[in-house]
Swiss-Prot record:
This is T cell receptor beta joining 1-6. J region of the variable domain of T cell receptor (TR) beta chain that participates in the antigen recognition. Alpha-beta T cell receptors are antigen specific receptors which are essential to the immune response and are present on the cell surface of T lymphocytes. Recognize peptide-major histocompatibility (MH) (pMH) complexes that are displayed by antigen presenting cells (APC), a prerequisite for efficient T cell adaptive immunity against pathogens. The keyword Nucleotide-binding does not apply. The gene is TRBJ1-6. GO terms for cellular component: T cell receptor complex. It is found in: Cell membrane. Its main location: membrane. Signal peptide: none annotated.
Length: 17
């Protein structure tokens, strides 16, 4: 879901709301 935190390969976690 878009409201779930996405984990990127650079180690940064971005939450798309």
């Amino acid at each position: 879901s878009y409201n779930s935190p996405l984990h990127f390969g650079n180690g940064t976690r971005l939450t798309v709301t």
